[in-house]
């Protein structure tokens, strides 16, 4: 993957806009850190904003087992997400970033799983209201990872963009934290047409009520959806399936969304090394030497 690092290396002139970083997410083995699963309890926020209506709720403890493993505050496999959270919090303080687009070059690289886990970890911080948006109007899967049971037709983003429902009819709120979820809704025959309507700006106005917005976007290569969504976002995180995704396609994805908006690249499903100390040291050195950038 060294060519990806070289491709992301920025000139001194680019650095004034911020830094791109690489976060390495280890492959999660089924049941890892989950032999004694406990319920995930985030500190509740006592003063929820009264101007945000929400008709439905979900239980994060019903989420897919690997999502629960990451969200367990004491899990080792979730540590990289907590590192990412810390970097993003600093970026928010420095640059006011709060709308994060999660995408990948190709399908099946782990972008939806990453978006769900990142949103869940961000919502564990006290007094932070987080919205997870499933904006993949072609192949929505976030609801499955969150453990939401399908009852009839999901009302969601596509219905709102089509002018069929109000936002409160589509939103779900976690019973355990200030994590909200906006499903994709019914699959759209022409997602680009829906995303080009003025109603997308109305959706973005709702996003302003949250401290963080994490948007699961369709893959970049071959589709126009992500570019439309990116114009409403502050930063982009690109998920790359380690040692699988062709470098040329990663390069194409970076160029299509714009390198200046990418705040980080996630190398997903890396094989674990024997020594976690060596693992952390090696990849920190890789970022410094190959990427030529600092922290997010």
Residue ranges and their predicted role:
Residues 1-296:
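P-loop NTP-binding module
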């Amino acid at each position: 993957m060294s060519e990806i690092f070289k491709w992301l290396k920025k000139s001194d002139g680019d650095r004034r806009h911020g830094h791109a970083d690489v976060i390495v997410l280890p492959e999660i083995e089924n049941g890892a850190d989950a032999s004694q699963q406990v319920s995930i309890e985030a500190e509740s926020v006592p003063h929820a904003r009264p101007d945000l209506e929400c008709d439905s709720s979900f239980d994060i403890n019903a989420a897919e087992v690997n999502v629960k493993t990451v969200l367990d505050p004491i899990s080792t496999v979730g540590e990289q997400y907590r590192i990412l959270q810390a970097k993003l919090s600093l970026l928010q303080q420095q640059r006011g970033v709060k709308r994060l687009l999660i995408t990948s070059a190709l399908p099946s690289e782990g972008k939806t799983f990453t978006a769900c886990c990142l949103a869940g970890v961000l919502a564990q911080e006290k007094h932070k209201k987080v919205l997870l948006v499933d904006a993949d109007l072609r192949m929505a899967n976030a609801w499955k990872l969150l453990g939401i049971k399908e009852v009839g037709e999901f009302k969601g983003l596509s219905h709102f963009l089509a002018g069929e429902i109000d936002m409160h009819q589509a939103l779900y709120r976690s019973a355990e934290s200030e994590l909200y979820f906006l499903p994709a809704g019914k699959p759209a025959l022409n997602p680009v047409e829906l995303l080009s309507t003025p109603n997308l700006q109305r959706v973005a106005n709702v996003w302003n009520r949250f401290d963080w917005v994490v948007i699961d976007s369709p893959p970049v290569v071959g589709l126009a959806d992500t570019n439309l969504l990116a114009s409403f976002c502050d930063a982009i995180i690109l998920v790359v399936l380690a040692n699988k995704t062709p470098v040329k396609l990663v390069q194409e994805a970076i160029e299509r969304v714009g390198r200046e908006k990418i705040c980080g690249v996630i190398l997903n499903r890396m094989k674990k090394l024997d020594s976690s100390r060596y693992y952390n040291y090696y990849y920190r050195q890789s970022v410094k030497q190959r990427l030529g950038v600092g922290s997010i």
